[in-house]
A protein has these predicted regions:
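Hydrophobic packing residues within well-ordered alpha-helices of enzyme cores
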Residues: 1, 90-91
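Phosphate-coordination/substrate-recognition cap region in phosphate-metabolizing enzymes
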Residues: 1-33
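Acidic, low-complexity terminal tails and accessory targeting/binding regions
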Residues: 15-26, 68-76, 91-151
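Short glycine/proline- and acidic residue-enriched helix-loop micro-motifs
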Residues: 33-54
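Short beta-strand scaffold positions
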Residues: 57, 81-82
């Protein structure tokens, strides 16, 4: 496929869940460390794992590399494929409109479309979230031209 470059970025790896890695919530339900972890917070990592703040910092590093490369190479469209937790944290941390991470949850094979300008990123470390991918259209009523011009 012409004009397609795939670059693996370690900054976009999934969150390190430490001692909770590869365990289900049911398996961890009576673990006091897990009970503490699910209370949330930016600086509340699982034992031997990574905090949300550390994940967001990694996301910033990745986005800075991606956006800088886009500007340098003159690219106007790129796709970033990564884990759902990173998608949610990237969009909540750097996306406009500002929303909670869970508001940016998506299923496998889904994601969001964002738009960024050099000045927006350089001045604000922000990008605009403009839609879902693939697009999800809400049911819209059918209108005729006459419907738009009647009182």
């Amino acid at each position: 496929q012409p004009n397609r470059l795939v670059a693996e970025m370690p900054e976009l790896r999934e969150m390190d869940f430490g001692k909770f890695e590869n365990k289900t919530a049911d398996e961890l339900m009576n673990d006091p460390d897990y009970e503490q972890f699910i209370k949330g917070g930016l600086d509340n990592p699982p034992p031997n794992g990574e905090s949300t703040r550390e994940v967001i910092n990694r996301c910033y590093e990745a986005l800075n590399i991606i956006i800088s490369d886009m500007m340098y190479e003159g690219l106007t469209n790129v796709a970033v494929c990564t884990h759902g937790g990173l998608i949610m944290n990237m969009l909540a941390g750097f996306g406009v409109p500002k929303r909670k991470p869970m508001d940016y949850a998506c299923d496998f094979g889904e994601g969001f479309e964002v738009m960024v300008t050099a000045s927006m990123w350089q001045r604000s470390n922000a990008f605009e979230v403009i839609g879902t991918y693939p697009p999800k259209y809400e049911e819209m009523p059918d209108y005729t031209v006459e419907d738009y011009y009647t009182d």
